[in-house]
Structure formats: C-alpha cells, structure tokens
C-alpha cells in the first residue's frame, strides 16, 4: 500500500455522515461577511470563505472505529493514521492504526506501531494484546517461517507483561482481562506445536470467562486438533448455546457434527450459520464442507464457490473440498487447479497433498497422467505424516 500524506481535512465529506453515527465534530468557525466597499444595494459583496478549524484526533479515532467495526479496514487505516499524525501520543490512534495494519497484512509496520504504543503507554493492556497478535499474524503469514521463528517467543514475552497488567487491574475487570491473556497465550502455544499446554491455557481462560464463545471455539478447535472429537463437539455446542447468533461457532459445530457422522444434525446447523452471515466466507464455506460430507455435491459446490469468491486467500480448506468435488466428477483439470491452490495456501496438510498427487496419478480424456508429479506429492505427504497409509499405497503404485 502506498504511503499517504494526510492533512487535517482528510475525508471531510465522509466525516459529516460517518461521525454522525459516532460523535459530532466540533463546529466550524462562523463565516464572516465582508462589508461592501461602497453603497450598492443591488450588488452585495460575496461573503469571505469560512475558516475550517482542524479536526481533533479523537474525531478521526471515532471514524476509524466506525470503519473498523464495519470491516472497512482500508478506510479505518486512513482515519487512524490521520489521528496519529495529528496526535502522535494518542494511544487510541496508535492502537487502531496497529490493528488496521494487521488486518491489511502490513505486519512489520503494525509491530512498529504497537511497540511505540506499549513503549509510551506501558500500562495499556489492549496494546500488549494487539502486539502479541501482530507477532502471531506475521508468523502465520510468512512465506519462510524460519525467518520469523523469534516472533512466538516475543509474543509470549509481551503476554507475560500483559498478565502482570491484568493482575493489577481493578477486581471487577481482573477475570475478564486475565481470560484475554490466557486465550492469546493458548493461540501462541498452538502455533508452537505445544498442544497440551495450549489446551490448558484455553481451559484456564474459559474458567475465568465461562460464557465467552470465542474461548470455547478455540478450546474445541484444540480438542479436535488432538483427536478428541467428543470434547471438541461439546465445547462448540457450549459456544453455540452461549452465543446463538455467532455464525463462526455454529458453522464449526456443524462441521464437527458432520465429521462425527451425524450429518442429519449437521446440515441444518450449517445452513443456519450461512443464513446468519451470508457474506461470511467461513460460514458459507463450512456449509459447503458439511454438504460435501452429507453427499450433497450440488449445494457443496455452490457454497464453496461462493466462499472462495468472498475471500480467495483465507480458507484453503475450501479449495481442497472443491478439488475433491472435481475429482469425484472426473474433472481432473479443475481438480488439479483447486488442489494446487489448497496446497499452496496450506501446504502442511498431508491429506491435501495426497489428493493432489492422486489427481496427477489419474488421467481422463485429454488430461494425461503425470506419474512424476504424483510421486513427488505422495513423497511430500509422507514426509509430513510417515504413517499416512493412502500416501504410501499411492507411492507404491507410481514407482
């Protein structure tokens, strides 16, 4: 994104509408009238142009929060940056700017912004949590994770500082603040591969804040990642009960039900999640996944196609299931394309790489088999999971 120089009148036209929903801007200086040079009633002199008072940083922060809440992160970034230029010591401006930069995948600038915030306002708990999240997102988004391996240790260090701040917060807020720290710590531990410690962190967060759907989602996700499907379903069911309008929780709950074999219960839950948030790619895509697992390829393809249209990069799983649909239909060209996208965006999943290999092993019509590429992908899958029987059988076939 190009750097923009922002003056105090930036987005003035937008402010008049958007700030009306947040807070009113200060009144402009009254217009002054220049008296006529000589009596001429038929030709009054035009009024002088009014002087517009500069808008304070707080107005831009309010505008940024308005846009951020609507998911308009580009516009939020512009507003928060204007606020930070007007008042470089505004913690609210720096926090909003850093969070917006993370959403726009500007990870290095986000870390710099949030470090500045936590340096000048060391007791800002939200700033510490946002900085820990920025370190994680830079790690997740890195093409070469070896270059950012220190990020997770830095995130844990920031969270240690955040925990001290949370412990010192007023008693009425302490449990809530500590739950945020432990939830974030669980996220970092998950990225480090410390599954058991991550589960304990999420459990501790949930004990502190038992009615928080996000924490229950994260706990259920870790249970699923470690093979405890029953506990995962229980945690997601609690999340849905806690917040019935949350499409993410309901969509994931539906997927876990389908994986357990209970597709009859899963399908209506998935459909409800997509109805709750028709523009949410996760909810729409998981309806597609559940439909695939329920042997409804028509609905599956429609929902998965819509999901990747809504967000082409965030959910490689949906390309994987589109590839599976293509394989089932014998469309090898489309299968290879979708499975290649899935693997490119999420290349640590052995199952996806195996099915990419299978698409190259097969041939149909003008699409010839490519045994060399099939072998390469089977070998990659086995490196990730040496006990993956399907990949071993595939490798035996193409040798």
Question: Where are the language model's segments positioned?
Answer:
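Helix-start (N-cap) detector for alpha-helical repeat units in TPR-like alpha-solenoids
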Residues: 57-58, 91-92, 125-126, 170-172, ...
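Structural signature of tandem alpha-helical TPR/SEL1-like repeats
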Residues: 71-82, 103-116, 140-161, 191-204, ...
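Canonical tetratricopeptide repeat
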Residues: 62, 96, 130, 177, ...
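Short coil turns that delineate tetratricopeptide repeat
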Residues: 54, 88, 122, 167, ...
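Flexible helix-coil transition and linker loops at the boundaries of alpha-helical arrays
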Residues: 47-52, 126, 161-179, 308
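Alpha-helical segment of the N-proximal tetratricopeptide repeat
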Residues: 55-86, 103, 180, 184-192
């Amino acid at each position: 994104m190009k750097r923009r120089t922002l003056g105090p009148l930036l987005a003035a036209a937008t402010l008049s509408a958007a700030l009306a929903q947040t807070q009113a801007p200060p009144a402009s200086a009254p217009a002054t009238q220049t008296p006529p040079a000589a009596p001429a009633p038929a030709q009054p002199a035009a009024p002088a142009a009014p002087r517009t008072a500069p808008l304070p940083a707080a107005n831009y922060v309010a505008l940024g929060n308005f846009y951020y809440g609507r998911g308009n992160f580009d516009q939020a970034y512009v507003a928060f940056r204007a606020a930070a230029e007007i008042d470089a010591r505004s913690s609210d401006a720096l926090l909003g700017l850093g969070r917006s930069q993370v959403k726009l995948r500007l990870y290095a600038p986000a870390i710099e912004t949030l470090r500045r915030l936590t340096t000048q306002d060391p007791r800002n708990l939200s700033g510490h949590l946002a900085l820990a999240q920025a370190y994680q997102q830079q790690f997740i988004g890195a093409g070469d994770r070896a270059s950012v391996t220190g990020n997770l240790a830095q995130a844990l260090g920031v969270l240690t500082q955040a925990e001290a701040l949370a412990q010192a917060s007023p008693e009425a807020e302490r449990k809530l603040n500590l739950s945020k720290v432990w939830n974030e710590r669980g996220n970092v531990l998950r990225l480090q591969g410390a599954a058991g410690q991550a589960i304990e962190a999420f459990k501790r967060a949930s004990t502190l804040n038992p009615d928080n759907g996000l924490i229950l989602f994260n706990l259920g996700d870790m249970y699923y990642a470690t093979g405890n499907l029953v506990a995962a379903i229980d945690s997601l069911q609690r999340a849905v009960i806690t917040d019935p309008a949350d499409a993410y929780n309901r969509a994931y709950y539906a997927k876990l039900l389908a994986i357990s074999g209970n597709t009859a219960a899963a399908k209506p839950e998935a459909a409800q999640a997509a109805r709750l948030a028709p523009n949410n790619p996760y909810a729409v895509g998981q309806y597609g996944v559940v439909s695939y697992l329920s042997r409804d390829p028509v609905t599956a393809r429609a929902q998965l196609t819509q999901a990747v249209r809504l967000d082409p990069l965030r959910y490689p799983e949906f390309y994987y299931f589109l590839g599976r649909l293509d394989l089932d239909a014998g469309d090898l060209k489309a299968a290879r394309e979708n499975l290649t996208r899935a693997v490119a965006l999420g290349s640590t999943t052995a199952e996806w790489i195996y099915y990419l290999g299978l698409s190259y092993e097969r041939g149909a019509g003008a699409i010839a088999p490519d045994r060399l590429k099939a072998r390469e992908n089977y070998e990659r899958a086995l490196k990730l999971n040496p006990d993956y029987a399907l990949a071993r059988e595939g490798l035996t076939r193409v040798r």
